[in-house]
Amino acid sequence: MSEPTGNAAMAAAAAPAPSPGPAAAPAGTIYDLGYKRYTGARQATSTRWKVIARNQFASAWKTWWRYKVALGFAGIVTAVAGGVMFLLQDRVVNGVVVPGNIAAVLSDQALPMSITWYTRAAFLLSITLVSSVIARDMQSGAFTFYFARSVRPRDYVLGKLIGMFAVTSTVMLAGPLALALARLALSESLDQLVATLPILPKALAIGVLSTLAFAAVPLGFSAIIANPRHAMALWAVYYLVVGGMAYLLARLMKNGFGAVDITMAIEGLTYDVLDIVQLRGRSKRIETPLAVTSLLVHAAAGVSIIAYRVRRAHLAGIGGAS
Protein backbone atom coordinates (compact mmCIF):
# COMPACT_ATOMS: atom_id res chain seq x y z
CA MET A 1 0.00 0.00 0.00
CA SER A 2 1.50 3.32 -1.07
CA GLU A 3 2.20 6.09 1.41
CA PRO A 4 0.13 9.30 1.05
CA THR A 5 1.73 12.03 -0.96
CA GLY A 6 2.92 15.22 0.67
CA ASN A 7 -0.04 17.31 -0.48
CA ALA A 8 -2.55 14.74 0.79
CA ALA A 9 -0.84 14.56 4.16
CA MET A 10 -0.88 18.34 4.51
CA ALA A 11 -4.61 18.50 3.61
CA ALA A 12 -5.44 15.84 6.15
CA ALA A 13 -3.53 17.70 8.83
CA ALA A 14 -5.28 21.01 7.99
CA ALA A 15 -8.80 19.51 8.14
CA PRO A 16 -10.69 20.46 11.35
CA ALA A 17 -11.09 17.75 13.91
CA PRO A 18 -14.65 16.40 14.28
CA SER A 19 -16.50 18.11 17.15
CA PRO A 20 -17.59 15.83 19.94
CA GLY A 21 -21.36 15.22 20.29
CA PRO A 22 -23.42 16.90 23.05
CA ALA A 23 -22.66 15.40 26.41
CA ALA A 24 -25.58 13.61 28.02
CA ALA A 25 -26.91 15.50 31.05
CA PRO A 26 -26.57 13.51 34.24
CA ALA A 27 -29.78 12.28 35.83
CA GLY A 28 -31.38 14.67 38.29
CA THR A 29 -29.89 17.82 36.74
CA ILE A 30 -31.66 21.03 37.79
CA TYR A 31 -31.80 23.69 35.10
CA ASP A 32 -31.65 27.16 36.65
CA LEU A 33 -33.75 29.34 34.41
CA GLY A 34 -33.33 32.33 36.66
CA TYR A 35 -35.68 34.12 39.08
CA LYS A 36 -38.03 36.83 38.01
CA ARG A 37 -40.04 38.72 40.58
CA TYR A 38 -43.82 38.72 40.13
CA THR A 39 -44.84 42.07 38.68
CA GLY A 40 -48.59 41.57 38.34
CA ALA A 41 -51.38 43.06 40.40
CA ARG A 42 -51.39 42.23 44.10
CA GLN A 43 -54.34 42.30 46.45
CA ALA A 44 -54.10 43.75 49.90
CA THR A 45 -54.15 41.28 52.76
CA SER A 46 -57.27 42.93 54.14
CA THR A 47 -59.27 42.01 51.01
CA ARG A 48 -58.60 38.27 51.02
CA TRP A 49 -61.92 37.62 52.73
CA LYS A 50 -63.62 38.89 49.57
CA VAL A 51 -62.04 36.10 47.54
CA ILE A 52 -63.35 33.50 50.00
CA ALA A 53 -66.82 35.07 50.01
CA ARG A 54 -67.01 35.16 46.20
CA ASN A 55 -65.85 31.57 46.03
CA GLN A 56 -68.58 30.53 48.47
CA PHE A 57 -71.31 32.12 46.37
CA ALA A 58 -69.89 30.78 43.10
CA SER A 59 -69.59 27.26 44.52
CA ALA A 60 -73.16 27.37 45.83
CA TRP A 61 -74.51 28.57 42.50
CA LYS A 62 -72.99 25.57 40.71
CA THR A 63 -75.03 23.13 42.80
CA TRP A 64 -78.64 22.26 42.00
CA TRP A 65 -80.07 20.31 44.89
CA ARG A 66 -78.07 22.15 47.54
CA TYR A 67 -78.92 25.73 46.57
CA LYS A 68 -81.16 26.13 43.57
CA VAL A 69 -83.94 23.93 44.95
CA ALA A 70 -84.27 26.20 48.00
CA LEU A 71 -84.02 29.26 45.76
CA GLY A 72 -86.77 27.92 43.53
CA PHE A 73 -88.92 27.18 46.59
CA ALA A 74 -88.53 30.79 47.76
CA GLY A 75 -89.33 32.02 44.26
CA ILE A 76 -92.59 30.04 44.26
CA VAL A 77 -93.54 31.53 47.65
CA THR A 78 -92.86 35.03 46.32
CA ALA A 79 -94.90 34.42 43.17
CA VAL A 80 -97.88 33.02 45.08
CA ALA A 81 -97.92 35.78 47.71
CA GLY A 82 -97.45 38.46 45.06
CA GLY A 83 -100.25 36.95 42.99
CA VAL A 84 -102.57 37.03 46.00
CA MET A 85 -101.77 40.72 46.51
CA PHE A 86 -102.49 41.45 42.86
CA LEU A 87 -105.80 39.58 42.83
CA LEU A 88 -106.99 41.31 46.00
CA GLN A 89 -106.39 44.68 44.33
CA ASP A 90 -108.49 43.74 41.31
CA ARG A 91 -111.79 45.61 41.16
CA VAL A 92 -113.79 42.47 40.47
CA VAL A 93 -112.35 40.70 43.49
CA ASN A 94 -112.14 43.76 45.72
CA GLY A 95 -115.69 44.64 46.65
CA VAL A 96 -117.52 41.89 44.77
CA VAL A 97 -115.95 38.55 45.62
CA VAL A 98 -114.32 39.83 48.81
CA PRO A 99 -115.48 42.92 50.74
CA GLY A 100 -113.16 45.87 50.34
CA ASN A 101 -112.07 46.09 53.97
CA ILE A 102 -111.33 42.36 54.15
CA ALA A 103 -109.41 42.48 50.88
CA ALA A 104 -107.20 45.26 52.26
CA VAL A 105 -106.49 43.27 55.43
CA LEU A 106 -105.66 40.12 53.47
CA SER A 107 -103.37 42.08 51.17
CA ASP A 108 -101.47 43.46 54.16
CA GLN A 109 -101.15 39.98 55.66
CA ALA A 110 -99.71 38.36 52.53
CA LEU A 111 -96.15 39.33 53.49
CA PRO A 112 -96.19 38.24 57.15
CA MET A 113 -98.03 35.01 56.35
CA SER A 114 -95.36 34.12 53.78
CA ILE A 115 -92.52 34.44 56.32
CA THR A 116 -93.21 30.93 57.61
CA TRP A 117 -92.62 29.53 54.13
CA TYR A 118 -89.45 31.57 53.67
CA THR A 119 -88.07 30.09 56.89
CA ARG A 120 -88.75 26.61 55.52
CA ALA A 121 -86.84 27.45 52.36
CA ALA A 122 -84.00 28.87 54.47
CA PHE A 123 -83.90 25.73 56.62
CA LEU A 124 -83.77 23.58 53.48
CA LEU A 125 -80.81 25.65 52.28
CA SER A 126 -79.09 25.46 55.66
CA ILE A 127 -79.44 21.69 55.94
CA THR A 128 -78.16 21.00 52.42
CA LEU A 129 -75.41 23.60 52.16
CA VAL A 130 -74.62 25.94 55.05
CA SER A 131 -74.37 23.41 57.88
CA SER A 132 -71.56 21.46 56.17
CA VAL A 133 -69.32 24.21 54.76
CA ILE A 134 -66.60 24.36 57.43
CA ALA A 135 -66.92 20.65 58.21
CA ARG A 136 -66.03 19.88 54.59
CA ASP A 137 -62.97 22.14 54.82
CA MET A 138 -61.81 20.38 57.97
CA GLN A 139 -62.43 16.93 56.52
CA SER A 140 -60.70 17.63 53.19
CA GLY A 141 -57.73 19.46 54.70
CA ALA A 142 -58.61 22.73 53.00
CA PHE A 143 -57.30 24.66 56.01
CA THR A 144 -53.80 23.81 54.81
CA PHE A 145 -54.58 25.48 51.50
CA TYR A 146 -56.01 28.59 53.16
CA PHE A 147 -53.41 29.16 55.85
CA ALA A 148 -50.40 28.17 53.73
CA ARG A 149 -51.20 31.27 51.68
CA SER A 150 -51.13 33.57 54.69
CA VAL A 151 -54.90 33.76 55.00
CA ARG A 152 -55.56 35.00 58.49
CA PRO A 153 -58.19 33.27 60.63
CA ARG A 154 -60.34 36.41 60.67
CA ASP A 155 -60.21 36.54 56.86
CA TYR A 156 -61.47 32.97 56.69
CA VAL A 157 -64.25 33.55 59.23
CA LEU A 158 -65.36 36.82 57.62
CA GLY A 159 -65.26 35.35 54.12
CA LYS A 160 -67.33 32.31 55.07
CA LEU A 161 -69.87 34.37 57.01
CA ILE A 162 -70.38 36.99 54.32
CA GLY A 163 -70.46 34.36 51.59
CA MET A 164 -73.15 32.34 53.38
CA PHE A 165 -75.02 35.53 54.28
CA ALA A 166 -75.13 36.45 50.59
CA VAL A 167 -76.34 32.97 49.63
CA THR A 168 -79.01 32.88 52.35
CA SER A 169 -80.16 36.43 51.58
CA THR A 170 -81.38 35.33 48.15
CA VAL A 171 -83.89 33.14 49.99
CA MET A 172 -84.65 34.94 53.25
CA LEU A 173 -84.12 38.62 52.34
CA ALA A 174 -84.89 39.03 48.65
CA GLY A 175 -88.36 37.50 48.92
CA PRO A 176 -89.75 39.73 51.71
CA LEU A 177 -88.25 42.80 50.04
CA ALA A 178 -89.87 41.87 46.72
CA LEU A 179 -93.26 41.47 48.42
CA ALA A 180 -92.85 44.80 50.23
CA LEU A 181 -92.10 46.52 46.93
CA ALA A 182 -95.09 44.79 45.33
CA ARG A 183 -97.33 46.02 48.13
CA LEU A 184 -96.13 49.58 47.54
CA ALA A 185 -96.58 49.26 43.78
CA LEU A 186 -100.21 48.17 44.25
CA SER A 187 -101.14 51.27 46.25
CA GLU A 188 -104.25 52.90 44.82
CA SER A 189 -103.36 56.48 45.77
CA LEU A 190 -100.48 58.62 46.93
CA ASP A 191 -101.89 58.76 50.44
CA GLN A 192 -102.05 54.98 50.58
CA LEU A 193 -98.49 54.77 49.25
CA VAL A 194 -97.21 57.11 51.96
CA ALA A 195 -99.11 55.19 54.63
CA THR A 196 -97.72 51.87 53.40
CA LEU A 197 -94.14 53.10 52.89
CA PRO A 198 -92.85 51.97 56.34
CA ILE A 199 -93.33 48.36 55.27
CA LEU A 200 -90.12 48.58 53.22
CA PRO A 201 -87.61 49.25 56.05
CA LYS A 202 -89.52 46.82 58.27
CA ALA A 203 -89.22 44.06 55.69
CA LEU A 204 -85.53 44.90 55.28
CA ALA A 205 -84.90 44.64 59.03
CA ILE A 206 -86.80 41.35 59.30
CA GLY A 207 -84.94 39.92 56.33
CA VAL A 208 -81.49 40.96 57.58
CA LEU A 209 -81.99 39.50 61.07
CA SER A 210 -83.50 36.30 59.70
CA THR A 211 -80.71 35.90 57.16
CA LEU A 212 -78.07 36.48 59.82
CA ALA A 213 -79.56 33.76 62.02
CA PHE A 214 -79.92 31.21 59.22
CA ALA A 215 -76.35 31.90 58.03
CA ALA A 216 -74.39 32.10 61.30
CA VAL A 217 -76.04 29.35 63.36
CA PRO A 218 -75.80 26.47 60.83
CA LEU A 219 -72.27 27.62 59.97
CA GLY A 220 -71.42 27.41 63.66
CA PHE A 221 -72.69 23.83 63.80
CA SER A 222 -70.56 23.00 60.76
CA ALA A 223 -67.48 24.12 62.72
CA ILE A 224 -68.17 21.82 65.67
CA ILE A 225 -67.67 18.48 63.90
CA ALA A 226 -65.30 17.65 61.05
CA ASN A 227 -67.84 15.24 59.54
CA PRO A 228 -70.32 17.03 57.22
CA ARG A 229 -73.11 14.50 57.76
CA HIS A 230 -72.80 14.66 61.52
CA ALA A 231 -72.76 18.47 61.40
CA MET A 232 -75.96 18.50 59.33
CA ALA A 233 -77.60 16.05 61.72
CA LEU A 234 -76.59 18.11 64.75
CA TRP A 235 -78.06 21.28 63.24
CA ALA A 236 -81.27 19.46 62.28
CA VAL A 237 -81.65 18.11 65.82
CA TYR A 238 -81.21 21.57 67.32
CA TYR A 239 -83.59 23.24 64.89
CA LEU A 240 -86.33 20.62 64.93
CA VAL A 241 -86.08 18.98 68.36
CA VAL A 242 -84.86 21.82 70.57
CA GLY A 243 -86.99 24.33 68.69
CA GLY A 244 -90.01 22.05 68.95
CA MET A 245 -89.51 21.64 72.69
CA ALA A 246 -89.27 25.41 73.10
CA TYR A 247 -92.52 25.78 71.17
CA LEU A 248 -94.33 23.28 73.40
CA LEU A 249 -93.00 24.86 76.59
CA ALA A 250 -94.09 28.28 75.38
CA ARG A 251 -97.61 27.01 74.80
CA LEU A 252 -97.80 25.27 78.16
CA MET A 253 -96.21 28.03 80.25
CA LYS A 254 -97.71 30.95 78.28
CA ASN A 255 -94.43 32.85 78.18
CA GLY A 256 -91.81 33.98 75.70
CA PHE A 257 -89.64 30.87 75.99
CA GLY A 258 -90.61 30.05 72.42
CA ALA A 259 -88.10 32.66 71.23
CA VAL A 260 -85.47 29.93 71.61
CA ASP A 261 -86.97 28.51 68.42
CA ILE A 262 -85.43 30.51 65.56
CA THR A 263 -88.48 30.21 63.31
CA MET A 264 -90.82 31.18 66.12
CA ALA A 265 -88.69 34.22 66.93
CA ILE A 266 -88.77 35.31 63.27
CA GLU A 267 -92.53 34.85 63.06
CA GLY A 268 -93.12 36.74 66.30
CA LEU A 269 -90.86 39.56 65.14
CA THR A 270 -92.68 39.78 61.81
CA TYR A 271 -96.16 39.90 63.29
CA ASP A 272 -95.15 42.40 65.95
CA VAL A 273 -93.22 44.75 63.64
CA LEU A 274 -95.91 44.68 60.95
CA ASP A 275 -98.62 45.03 63.62
CA ILE A 276 -100.55 41.96 62.51
CA VAL A 277 -102.78 40.17 65.00
CA GLN A 278 -101.70 36.56 65.11
CA LEU A 279 -104.97 34.67 64.84
CA ARG A 280 -103.28 31.28 64.60
CA GLY A 281 -99.71 30.18 64.69
CA ARG A 282 -97.04 28.69 66.81
CA SER A 283 -97.87 30.13 70.23
CA LYS A 284 -98.19 33.28 72.22
CA ARG A 285 -97.12 36.47 70.52
CA ILE A 286 -93.42 37.26 70.96
CA GLU A 287 -92.54 40.91 71.39
CA THR A 288 -89.90 42.57 69.23
CA PRO A 289 -87.17 43.02 71.92
CA LEU A 290 -87.30 39.35 72.88
CA ALA A 291 -87.29 38.16 69.27
CA VAL A 292 -84.40 40.44 68.28
CA THR A 293 -82.41 39.38 71.34
CA SER A 294 -82.94 35.71 70.52
CA LEU A 295 -81.82 36.10 66.90
CA LEU A 296 -78.76 38.17 67.84
CA VAL A 297 -77.73 35.75 70.59
CA HIS A 298 -78.07 32.83 68.18
CA ALA A 299 -75.96 34.63 65.58
CA ALA A 300 -73.32 35.68 68.13
CA ALA A 301 -73.05 32.11 69.42
CA GLY A 302 -72.56 30.79 65.90
CA VAL A 303 -69.86 33.35 65.09
CA SER A 304 -68.07 32.64 68.39
CA ILE A 305 -67.97 28.91 67.69
CA ILE A 306 -66.60 29.50 64.20
CA ALA A 307 -63.92 31.91 65.42
CA TYR A 308 -62.83 29.57 68.22
CA ARG A 309 -62.57 26.49 66.02
CA VAL A 310 -60.74 28.27 63.20
CA ARG A 311 -58.32 29.96 65.57
CA ARG A 312 -57.64 26.66 67.31
CA ALA A 313 -56.93 24.95 64.00
CA HIS A 314 -54.63 27.78 63.00
CA LEU A 315 -52.63 27.65 66.24
CA ALA A 316 -52.34 23.87 65.97
CA GLY A 317 -49.74 24.39 63.26
CA ILE A 318 -51.84 24.03 60.14
CA GLY A 319 -50.79 27.42 58.77
CA GLY A 320 -48.36 30.17 59.37
CA ALA A 321 -50.21 33.49 59.15
CA SER A 322 -50.89 35.62 62.15
PLM region descriptions:
Residues 126-130, 174, 178, 216-217, ...:
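Hydrophobic/aromatic residues in alpha-helical transmembrane segments
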Residues 133-166:
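Helix-loop-helix units of permease transmembrane domains in multi-pass membrane transporters
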Residues 65-90, 121-124, 235-243:
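Hydrophobic alpha-helical transmembrane segments of multi-pass membrane transport/permease proteins
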Residues 2-22, 87-92, 96-109, 229-322:
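Terminal transmembrane helical anchor/hairpin motif
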Residues 45-47, 54-73:
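Membrane-interface helix starts
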Residues 110-136:
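Long, hydrophobic alpha-helical segments
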Residues 21-43, 306:
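Short, contiguous pre-domain boundary segments
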Residues 105-119, 158-159, 163-219, 223, ...:
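Secretory targeting signals
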